């Protein structure tokens, strides 16, 4: 056996010796793959295929050269093939084993190469999870804008956008966010950044003329970088002024030296930069050392706006654009998760406006209204008209004549012409010299243009009335600062600035938002609003005798027992308490104007606050119930008398209303809301009248005799508060008494510019306004007080054809009413103040969608 083994070993040795002696060599396998070989130096001695950057010229590349060496320089994601790749020059992102250390991994590296689940497949984060990695004491805030992403896209096609849909499901989202008017890109982005209306921050459109600067502003002009255009304090400055750092990857205004400075980091706008590169840069900012890392970051992409303009809002192309936007969000969230920041960063995803379909068949031409279109016109969905010879003719241009010539010219017009001061107050679009005096409010899907030379009428556009559903924008939020799985009612984008300040623990600069109104979005609200403090308390107006002699010029022949009728106004304390419980169920409106002299007047069915400064009520409040009757009885005719509680020198008189004047006395509380003729006398008094243009009384009377009873039936009763507004300088705030007294129209009675009506009911319509324990519903209106009804082309039309449509155009927030009157509503509500602020900032919507 041993001999056999020795023989075998000897044979092997001989064989090897012979092989070596004959020069046999070990076989070399030719190269067949580029894995780990990309960009290697070419060698003629190498066998097999090549992977150098010239191999395509020699037609000598390995079969996987394209996938292994070329695609990584064009791709923003990993693949199984790329995992563990050798480092390649000029790749967009890396999938090499050391990419985490080098901080240049593709955002999906861990999920593709390390087997971790993707952010999209993860469950929604629990509030108890550890949120931030070491070094992040405060959650960064990312503000991400997807231009032109209308809320309806997400409503209709959410299943095609899994990343956005997950953000919606896991975080907080609004049904929609309301843009400011005009619903344009620069306008709304800068409003979001400052919390200011366009009239306040100055960017009133994408194209502007300023007579004081004698300059034109446009998106493409160099003058857009002139800081003189940009007012207010954008959020990036608020952050840096208070010790934080801010970085903006494109945002209107961020590349302008506003107030002498820029954001800590900013990028000059360049639309050619891929969305993925923008996300990658934002993630790199979050990788910076703590001393350099921004606390606030913005990110902007042009889609789906660009595609919406080209193809319209309902198209296969828009779906592709939405999916591109969705992938961009997914890339951001994957990158955040890879850094363990996905539950640390607070992210707000929103849009500036929506998108509407347009057609060249839906154009209103000014050439059809003027023989000579001798003016300058900003054409489109939000047109403005001014003199073409500026600055010379800027102030002398006949704006009123233009509006008159565009009013009620055709049986069907697809726009309404307004002087800026007459625009609906909800738009807040008057108080800036840059807002031209002539404005056209255009119907949905229509545009107003000069003449038939206009050709930009295909696809989609935006700029329309911000109440149009097509102009509504998305709002979604996610992160440790926000409530989870939370849907909230709509709100306006002026509120976002305060919200961002709260997330960053900053003190906001003055703005048009209502701080605290979005506290219900936040897990732990940073700011607690305080109740308003009344500045002027009511005085006493004691019951007194009828003045003798009575020089008021008032008469009421139907009253036979004047003393008995007047005694009805002399309520004892118990009767006053009962009246307040009935007529002021949510508390008395508080007066926030300084040095206002007024007294409370109690009647059984209504209460008013009579002002000795303006000789009329500041407000009148009453509650009406659901009635099966569809009409109210007529008021007693030719019956008006002095209120014996008001001294004659502080009272209106009937002689103030001469027949040759255009004004007539109107009633804040309708006398015929009382159940009997005798009770009507409680309201047929001078303390209940206000001056109204005769044309306006048609609207006012129909509103009260027909529409308010209708709404009371629909809502199981209403509390009604109404009163005058004085805003002669159209700044959206109440005028001083000195200003008011300059507008008395040949009488000592000042003439209001508007009247307000606030209708409050119980959201649960089982309950009446008086026994409502839950949330309230509100309809509020600010009605322009105009001498005629040309706004509705209604001088000869019956009221049922136009009044309701008119008041709906002039819907408003309760907060708008407060600012214009100096009043504070709902002071008696027991609910938390942020809930009351939600009610005050709610804007009813009546606009019907286009069929």
Swiss-Prot record:
GO CC field: extracellular region
Residues binding a divalent metal cation 1, per UniProt? 305, 309, 462
| Disulfide cross-links | 34-38, 34-51, 38-69, 49-51, 49-62, 55-61, 62-69, 78-83, 78-95, 83-113, 93-95, 93-106, 99-105, 106-113, 124-170, 132-344, 360-457, 408-793, 541-599, 554-654, 556-639, 762-772
Q: What is its EC number?
A: 3.6.1.-
Main subcellular localisation = secreted
Q: Give the record's glycosylation annotations as residue positions.
A: 39, 216, 259, 270, 405, 512, 594, 674, 745
| Tissue expression per record | Expressed by venom gland.
Q: Which GO biological-process labels does this protein carry?
A: nucleoside triphosphate catabolic process
Q: Where in the cell is it found?
A: Secreted
- Catalytic site positions: 185 (amp-threonine intermediate)
Family designation: Belongs to the nucleotide pyrophosphatase/phosphodiesterase family.
**What's the protein name?**
Venom phosphodiesterase 1
Organism of origin is Crotalus adamanteus
